[in-house]
């Protein structure tokens, strides 16, 4: 199935393509797989959808997990309404960048990565993160 357990070796980076969907458990499992790789680790994380009233709690749990990890930079994609809430929570961390759409994400991650780095791309289907894979170096 496209977007699940797919590894793409590109000219500069290796991409873990997990773009098909996201749940709190699968995000943590994929981050752990990423961290087993050598060199620098980056995450492109589209917000998880359909979590109901627990959504903010689940996202905060993932953010704490990322903050405690070796991930150099996390590009987080969320709706504008959620950005205000999450930005306030994450402003003390320099690991996170916020976007409301996928337009400039590949360009941004390409500025941070160097040869041999690893990038995990994970998020809910509605973000269509697979569209940016071919734009990452």
What are these regions (language model features)?
Residues 1-137:
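ATP-dependent carboxylate-amine ligase
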């Amino acid at each position: 199935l496209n977007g699940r357990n797919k590894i793409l070796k590109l000219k500069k980076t290796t991409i873990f393509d997990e773009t098909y969907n996201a749940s709190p458990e699968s995000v943590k499992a994929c981050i752990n797989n990423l961290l087993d790789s050598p060199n620098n680790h980056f995450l492109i994380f589209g917000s998880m959808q359909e979590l109901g009233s627990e959504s903010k709690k689940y996202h905060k749990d993932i953010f704490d997990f990322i903050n405690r990890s070796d991930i150099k930079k996390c590009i987080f994609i969320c709706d504008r309404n959620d950005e205000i809430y999450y930005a306030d929570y994450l402003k003390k961390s320099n690991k996170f960048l916020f976007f409301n759409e996928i337009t400039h994400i590949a360009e941004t991650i390409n500025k941070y990565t160097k040869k041999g780095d690893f990038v995990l791309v994970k998020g809910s289907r509605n973000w269509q993160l697979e569209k940016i894979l071919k734009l990452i170096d």
